[in-house]
């Protein structure tokens, strides 16, 4: 199956952000509805989508290092809402983990975001891929919910095989 690396459905929070033009809206409801319809349209034509950048990746400056601190309410009602809508209403096939940290955990190995919320609460059945070079570990990422490391196999190649064979990852 071919996969579109999009749509990018982060909230347009910073007007001067380098990738704000990619995001659908500053309004979480509108972003969610647009993401749902984009996903349905693409996947109805046998093209998988990969919703990005999950989650709270709303600025370019220091995006690979920033540790986002946000209230539970703001996170759920603003920043996660478009992702939740596209997962629940359109069964998005893929999600791309963002570069940043959320509450001290890299998005690519964030058990709460990937396993508990995305898969647990929302019922996501697809694959989670890292942003390019956005994987930071083997065991923590594998157990934290990441399925595919992009664009190489630094952590999910031999290191992952060794972890599986050692019984650290199952």
Where are these regions (language model features)?
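Glycoside hydrolase catalytic-domain context in secreted enzymes
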Residues: 1-170
């Amino acid at each position: 199956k071919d996969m579109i690396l999009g749509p990018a459905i982060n909230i347009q929070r910073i007007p001067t952000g380098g990738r704000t033009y990619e995001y659908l809206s500053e309004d979480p409801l509108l972003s969610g509805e647009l993401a749902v319809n984009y996903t349905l349209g693409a996947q109805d034509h046998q093209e998988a989508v990969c919703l990005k950048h999950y989650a709270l990746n709303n600025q370019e400056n220091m995006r690979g290092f920033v540790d986002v601190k946000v209230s539970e309410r703001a996170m759920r009602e603003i920043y996660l809402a478009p992702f939740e809508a596209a997962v629940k209403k359109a069964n998005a096939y893929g999600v791309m983990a963002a570069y940043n940290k959320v509450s001290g955990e890299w998005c690519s190995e964030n058990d709460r975001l990937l396993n508990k919320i995305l898969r647990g609460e929302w019922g996501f059945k697809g694959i989670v891929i890292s942003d390019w070079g956005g994987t930071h570990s083997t065991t923590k990422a594998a157990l934290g919910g990441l399925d595919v490391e992009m664009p190489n196999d630094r952590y999910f190649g031999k290191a992952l095989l060794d972890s599986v064979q050692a019984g650290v990852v199952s």
